[in-house]
Amino acid sequence: MISIITTSYNYSEYISETIKSVLAQTYSEWELIIVDDASTDNSVEMIKPFCEDKRIKLLCHDKNKGLAKAIQTGLKYAKGEWIAFLESDDLWTENTLLERVKAIESHPQIGLIFNDVEEFGEKNSVLAVKNNLDKVRQKLAKMEFPRNIFYDINIENLLLTFSAVMVKHDALKKCSLATPIDALLDWWIFIHIAYKNEAFYINKKLTKWRQHKNSYLYNKNKKAYRSVNISAYIDIWKIEKLGTKFLPFILKTVVLTVFKRGTKFYYVVFVRKIKKLLGIKLKPSPLFDD
């Protein structure tokens, strides 16, 4: 069975359509866990009628706790071997789960599945993401799957949106959800799962990614991604108890990043943040320090 977790917060205009896209799935062995994070609109009233289907469960927070806490609440009730994420403003095509199950059957060793997306919604918002999505697709087309994508995604994001991802439940249980930036919980999870698990990419537009100005996407920026990257490395180091193995672990990522983005990016992003997070005293660089 697949457990689908949808977090809800003031998306009453979209949530019904999102739920209907789950009900339309050709693969029927699923449960949908909706966690409403104290919406102030009529989201809960929109969701309740769908709970007549016993596969759909609604959980409500009495106060707003944020995305990470909402996901944690959903995971407490999840029974599936796999966890799929579907944001409350996105949609799936009718064969989304079926295609993912086929991938699992063909590659049982994988721990992460992701697929291509169809962007839709506000015209300007769609145009804003189109070029970047096309570049990512070109890169993915040159890669062979299944593969471990940990170092790939630390150089640049290859996972298009949260609603396009499904992860193995056992792998997710080992993942800390203590992201320093709530809006980037998806990125935090991707890094953790990718560290020890192979991924498989489905080159089909199985997720419909809605673009609008109230989306989480518009609360994200490059500096935030970098901060989450480093924090995730430290978290993995602690969870996996890497000890002295941490140095080659971080060194490989540093070398790849220097090669890709240059020395200044390495110093500002990696050295400074590792210094801050680990309390390591490093001599300032007159070349790069502001």
Predicted features by range, described:
Residues 67-69, 97-171:
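Flexible acidic/His/Gly-enriched loops in nucleotide-sugar-dependent glycosyltransferase catalytic domains
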Residues 11-24:
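Short, well-formed alpha-helical segments that are part of the catalytic scaffolds
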Residues 1-2, 23-34, 42, 54-57:
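Short loop->beta transition adjacent to catalytic acidic/histidine clusters or analogous donor-positioning motifs
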Residues 76, 136-222, 229:
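Conserved nucleotide-sugar donor-binding catalytic segment
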Residues 83:
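Short aromatic/hydrophobic "clamp" motif used to bind/position activated sugar donors
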Residues 21, 28, 36-45, 63, ...:
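A conserved acidic beta->alpha catalytic loop
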Residues 16, 41-49, 91, 95:
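Acidic helix N-cap motif at the loop->helix transition within catalytic regions
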Residues 61-78, 99:
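Glycine-rich, basic loop-to-helix element that forms the pyrophosphate-binding segment
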